[in-house]
């Protein structure tokens, strides 16, 4: 039987032990914010579900998305105001370029979680996810059944991050495609595009690792598919490794964001 860590009686609610744990954790944690700084499509939304659902950390990823244009222009005031009322953040701008450095400066004594994924698997997911809403409208705005045309404002962050890679698809603008499958297949055949995307993805990981090289306690590198994910997060947060875990991995976005989507085991 696992030994229960000591907890102040004021947090001990037998009717809702998870709520008790969350209050205990958020009242006693010895760090400021926590940021998920993995690239998009590495499991950052699943990480958000865990941090919100298990640890009770306040988060709202749309806050960063809403002010991304300001951040791109070097104005962090709205973002800082939003994040002052939250404990965890992922997605834009934390998932982009070197914005983790700005977050580190704005919110000292914070923790950073870098979600990792096999490069080839990441690229496939990246292309599948952004093909319809970002890549196809840029290449061929009048493409067949293009019901996802996005305004230039909403594309700005994607172009700012992936402009060099999109330039490798420039010649496709002069082509006509009968179906989406033809266009997507043509993109997949462009080796330089794939290699450039993967190189940018891997280089960013290296930059993050270098930045935190002398601050190992501030950076956790994980894969969300790791069966020991919660143990590693617990230890990273200064908790006993086995204090809380979930019984099953998060399988799809339909259950994300809800505490009920995580079947947990709690020991205290």
PLM features per residue range, with description:
Residues 1-29, 137-139, 152, 166-173, ...:
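Membrane-proximal basic amphipathic "stem/tether" segments
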Residues 88, 192-193, 218:
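Residue-level detector of alpha-helix boundaries and kinks
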Residues 33-37, 195-196, 219-220:
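A detector of helix-start/N-cap boundary segments at the beginnings of structured domains
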Residues 64-71, 113-124, 143-147, 152, ...:
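The conserved 3'-phosphoadenosine-5'-phosphosulfate
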Residues 91-95, 193-204, 225:
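Soluble or luminal CAZymes and related metallo-dependent hydrolases
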Residues 8-199, 207, 214, 228-240:
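PAPS-dependent sulfotransferase catalytic domain
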């Amino acid at each position: 039987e696992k030994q229960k860590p000591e907890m102040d009686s004021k947090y001990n609610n037998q009717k809702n032990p998870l709520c008790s744990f969350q209050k205990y954790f958020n009242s006693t944690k010895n760090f400021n914010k926590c940021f998920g700084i993995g690239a998009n499509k590495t499991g950052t939304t699943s990480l958000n579900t865990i941090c919100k659902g298990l640890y009770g950390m306040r988060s709202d990823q749309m806050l960063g998305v809403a002010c991304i244009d300001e951040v791109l222009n070097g104005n962090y005031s709205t973002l800082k105001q939003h994040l002052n009322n939250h404990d965890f953040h992922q997605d834009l701008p934390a998932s982009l370029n070197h914005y983790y450095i700005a977050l580190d400066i704005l919110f000292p004594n914070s923790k950073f979680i870098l979600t990792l994924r096999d490069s080839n698997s990441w690229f496939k997911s990246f292309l599948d996810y952004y093909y319809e809403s970002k890549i196809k409208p840029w290449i061929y705005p009048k493409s067949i059944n293009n019901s996802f045309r996005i305004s230039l404002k909403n594309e700005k962050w994607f172009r700012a991050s992936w402009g060099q890679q999109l330039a490798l698809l420039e010649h496709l603008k002069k082509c006509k495609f009968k179906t989406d499958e033809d266009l997507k297949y043509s993109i997949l055949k462009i080796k330089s595009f794939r290699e450039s995307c993967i190189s940018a993805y891997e280089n960013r990981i290296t930059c993050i690792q270098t930045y935190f090289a002398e601050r190992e306690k501030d950076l956790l590198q994980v894969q969300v598919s790791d069966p020991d994910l919660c143990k590693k997060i617990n230890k990273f947060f200064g908790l006993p490794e086995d204090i809380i875990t979930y019984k099953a991995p998060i399988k799809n976005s339909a259950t994300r964001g809800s505490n009920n989507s995580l079947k947990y085991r709690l020991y205290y």
